[in-house]
Amino acid sequence: MIGPPGSGKSMLAARLPGLLPMLDGEAARGSAAVLSLVGQFRPEAFGVRPYRQPHHTASAVALVGGGNPPRPGEISLAHHGVLFLDELPEFDRKVLETLREPLESGHIHIARAARHARFPAEFQLVAAMNPCPCGYSGHGNGKCRCTPDQIARYRGRISGPFLDRIDLLIEVPAVPVDALDGTGDGESSATVRSRVEAALARQRERQGKANSRLTAKEVDTLCQPDDSGAGLLKQASVRLGLSARAWHRVLKVARTIADLAGSASIRAPHVAEAIQYRRLSGG
């Protein structure tokens, strides 16, 4: 999420666990087991998806794990839950790069001297950042005085390969003052959660796991859009220069959008929405 200070990025991230289904069976036990390793498991929270928000000064060991003996880091403590990285460009770039492996594999392997450990790390990564160093680029108040070079250097702190592993990039605009005292007409968390539960049930019935865990080969089999959707994706691939990884990730997002809509097939509108979420990254 990219937006100015006070636009609600942190609040949106904190609400995400409430939109996800409760953990059950093996997933709940797996999450509890990791938390127990660092003495943070609470019986009353069994089945609740963890939400972790490490500070941007966190070291690589704090984030991915380490030590002697090896201990799980924040990515493993967020297993089956949400890992929120606020002020993303403020994290050390080398620290962020350590996330690339677990984002793909769902686990992290740690080797320290004669000690080796493999911890699970299937987490939902959510990140937030300002659009520029001062935070007000594009804001209607005209406060921003950042130069194009300063903005480019700020955004350049996040590598292309890291961004390539993020499926949804969205702008969160500032909330108008006259909208702050309104109640709004959006859906409740319970309504959205019911739709998410139904979509996840479809995925498990179809392939035995969530769309996010599909391999590239499985995506080619299970996430093919109809003719109009396929044509749209090919056009976007050329225009945006999508990598092979980005291509498969767009298909997984489109499959998920279709599942949320209750559609058995992936149609052009589903593909168009999935492509839209990658436009900020340029592919």
Which residues are covered by each model-predicted region?
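Conserved ASCE/P-loop NTPase catalytic core
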Residues: 1-158
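Basic, amphipathic alpha-helical bundle interface domains used for macromolecular binding and assembly
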Residues: 70, 93-283
